[in-house]
């Protein structure tokens, strides 16, 4: 019998978002064994169940109220939303926040030896895709008619196999397209992972747990986007040094024993510190510059 007091979260069992989703949950302090073949895993330290399913099942599980939360790519979520609307449904859910992983783009690609004069080049052509609704919305907005060839995998082989004239598929680096004699010609949708919540009344205990998780997720993402920086900086150029390192708060300044010309400076910077920035700090007279990762952060 299902325990309705436990928070149910759906995530991809294996694939593009699986490892990052697992890492996010672990860094939020959820102790759970996700290395087994079980489809439902129970957290050891929180009333949370993790459902490990196919990524294209996650939006439906949330929209139908089977699970409370889902970690899903925006591309899969939007495709399911358009699919349900096309069937006359009114799907409901909340997007709690965009996450900092799973970045990709849904793009049109054509054979490298064919001319490309913009989307109108696809008028009347057959296009292979796993995202027919996103493709249709984009080309309808352009006033372009086309024939759709629905494939659930290996979309990139369609032109060589004579199944389609072009494809619409996810692209990360473009290496797979190149290996199949294709080139990316148009980006139609940019996507990242996101966290969504089912619509409807939520038990107070569950909502409190969701609120706690949201604070932790914010801390994890903020920590990944920030660095802890320590250095010795000349007092006369302190303002210039601080200007190079944007942060949420002012830095901590500490005196150096026996040195009136320099101070020790500690701060959290919200920007990734590149070599160019470190070279500028060095040119201002800073020394002993240390840049450290942050595991957890809460403002």
From Swiss-Prot:
Pfam families xref list: HisG, HisG_C
Keywords assigned: Amino-acid biosynthesis, ATP-binding, Cytoplasm, Glycosyltransferase, Histidine biosynthesis, Magnesium, Metal-binding, Nucleotide-binding, Transferase
InterPro entries: ATP-PRT_HisG_long, ATP_PRibTrfase_cat, ATP_PRibTrfase_CS, ATP_PRibTrfase_HisG, HisG_C, N-reg_PII-like_a/b, N-reg_PII/ATP_PRibTrfase_C
Gene3D superfamilies: 3.30.70.120, Periplasmic binding protein-like II
Superkingdom, natural source: Bacteria
EC class name: transferase
Entry-linked PROSITE patterns: ATP_P_PHORIBOSYLTR
Any one of the GO BP annotations: L-histidine biosynthetic process
Protein EC: 2.4.2.17
Record's catalysed reaction(s): 1-(5-phospho-beta-D-ribosyl)-ATP + diphosphate = 5-phospho-alpha-D-ribose 1-diphosphate + ATP
Pathway: Amino-acid biosynthesis; L-histidine biosynthesis; L-histidine from 5-phospho-alpha-D-ribose 1-diphosphate: step 1/9
Cofactor(s) named in the record: Mg(2+)
KW 4Fe-4S (keyword) present: no
GO molecular function: ATP binding; ATP phosphoribosyltransferase activity; magnesium ion binding
Location(s), subcellular: Cytoplasm
Regulation: Feedback inhibited by histidine.
Biological function: Catalyzes the condensation of ATP and 5-phosphoribose 1-diphosphate to form N'-(5'-phosphoribosyl)-ATP (PR-ATP). Has a crucial role in the pathway because the rate of histidine biosynthesis seems to be controlled primarily by regulation of HisG enzymatic activity.
Quaternary structure (record): Equilibrium between an active dimeric form, an inactive hexameric form and higher aggregates. Interconversion between the various forms is largely reversible and is influenced by the natural substrates and inhibitors of the enzyme.
Cited HAMAP family: HisG_Long
Annotated family: Belongs to the ATP phosphoribosyltransferase family. Long subfamily.
Designated name of the protein: ATP phosphoribosyltransferase
Organism of derivation: Escherichia coli O17:K52:H18 (strain UMN026 / ExPEC)
Gene this chain is encoded by: hisG
